[in-house]
């Protein structure tokens, strides 16, 4: 056992540990809780989208569809998990895909609004349809990729984190380097954020397998990025006072995010990895008389 780094633990002592879920290739309770929460939010958003399409004018016309679809979305998740339990990492993969799709939809929508004349802008029905479509497609893609290719909660969350931070840093640095008096400044910044979002997603998918972080490590990385941005940006504004330059502030904030992410990466480098359990087949046993 020492050679194989194996230990014996009573099942009762595992509690909410992911060990049992990983061994059985079943989603953890934490994953499912996050998926239920996001499915309700998706249902509420779908209700809002429908109210825009139908041009609902009463409070009931707006609220009731959202409530029904919010509860219905959670019911669909429960039905799927009851019929065919989600595999380990799949719920988080769905959530990551949903968030990526939402971010894509928002950025593309506002980029389009920024690049065209006011009379060519999309109507609310088109805007909400694009955002809803990207969100739904992202959730579906995340579920398919997670189920077919196999993943872990940490890997799936890592992809969402790399894409978000890449978009944020790219957008802020572009803001700092762009002449904000230029009429095309806003669409340039939004397009840069879109490129950063997709580059981060691709980079995250390529690196997730080798990094294979636990979801706890991903949260620490996010904390590092948030803390670094607040620290650097806050200190700059505090030091400059009334003479604060907006472009310098966003550049320093972006630098702080990168520094915070890098620091968190180094500090968490010793955390254990979250590898999938590879199923093995038992070796054949033969018996011979002696």
Language-model features and meaning:
Residues 35, 39, 56-82:
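Glycine- and aromatic-enriched membrane insertion/assembly motifs of diderm outer-membrane
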